[in-house]
A protein has these predicted regions:
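Sec-dependent bacterial lipoprotein signal peptides
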Residues: 1-22
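Conserved functional micro-motifs across diverse proteins
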Residues: 22-162
Length: 162
């Protein structure tokens, strides 16, 4: 009887020790990169599919929402990855048009691999070309970003204004 109690206490202590050690390691892994965490919350992905073939993929992180004190109050700023099937020219491909609430005027900054944000991209497509895109702020309550192609259709992503 006493041997059984000692055995159960020993097993219980081992399990408690094992679980507590795992929890600390797991928390350290999860909370290492706060830029990644914040960015992941405001990252959305959509694609253009035509006849069961993916023609383009865009993943967008709304930077103003993820880091409100870091970004320009005059612009809505986005980290955008664009992958276009066949010849991946990103936004240089004139067959695809990027817009926000029908506005096609924006500032485009190519994101190079040595840029500080590059290593914190929440959902990284290795085939995409990345940009920081700035649209001038207006009175809009929602931000509807659209990548469109005349033949293949549209990919839409909608954010609430921050």
């Amino acid at each position: 009887m006493i041997k059984n109690i000692i055995k159960y206490v020993g097993i219980s202590l081992f399990v408690v020790f094992f679980i507590s050690a795992c929890a600390k390691k797991t928390l350290n892994i999860i909370s290492k990169d706060s830029l990644y965490e914040k960015g992941l919350e405001y990252t959305l992905i959509n694609d253009i599919v035509y006849k069961n073939d993916t023609k383009a993929i865009m993943n967008i992180t709304y930077l103003n929402a993820s880091e409100p004190n870091e970004y320009d109050y005059k612009y809505h700023e986005f980290l955008i990855g664009i992958y276009i099937d066949d010849i991946n020219e990103g936004l240089q491909n004139k067959q695809y048009i990027l817009s926000m609430n029908s506005n096609t005027k924006y500032i485009q900054i190519p994101l190079k691999k040595d840029h500080p944000l590059y290593n914190h991209i929440p959902v990284k497509n290795p085939y995409a070309i990345y940009y920081i895109i700035k649209f001038k702020k207006g009175l809009e309550k929602t931000l509807s970003l659209k990548l469109s192609h005349k033949k293949f259709g549209n990919a839409n992503i909608i954010y609430k204004r921050f």
